[in-house]
């Protein structure tokens, strides 16, 4: 099994671990008023990333775009968690474990993008020299 494929599988497992933590520790303890607004948005985002990771594992779609989307959604999820803490919908102690998992996921995504992402060649993405 190639290193890129193996790291992709690790990425999917790390995302599933994060999802389990978010569902069990963060969303379950949210106040009802926030669970159906911010919580629903967080759930939707988690499933969008899971869908992209399945596409990556099946090798369908543009790898670079999918990895980029996973990276953006992971950062968005971290922002949502920070917002939840600021509005007192999420306990402060829940931030650090979630942030550590998201940072680890970001590192894996960055490594995958570096080693084999099909970067689109356009004016927005000039060639590295």
PLM regions with names:
Residues 1-129:
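Amphipathic alpha-helical assembly/interaction segments
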């Amino acid at each position: 099994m190639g290193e890129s494929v193996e790291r992709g599988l690790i990425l999917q497992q790390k995302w599933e671990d994060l999802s389990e933590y978010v569902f069990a520790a963060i969303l379950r303890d949210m106040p009802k008023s926030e669970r159906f607004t911010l919580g629903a948005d967080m759930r939707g985002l988690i499933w969008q990333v899971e869908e992209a990771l399945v596409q990556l594992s099946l090798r369908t779609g543009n790898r670079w775009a999918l990895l980029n989307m996973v990276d953006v959604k992971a950062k968005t999820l971290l922002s949502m968690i920070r917002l939840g803490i600021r509005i007192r919908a999420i306990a402060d102690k829940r931030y650090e474990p979630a942030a550590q998992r998201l940072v680890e996921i970001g590192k894996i995504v960055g490594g995958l993008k570096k080693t084999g992402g099909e970067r689109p060649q356009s004016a927005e993405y000039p060639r590295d020299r």
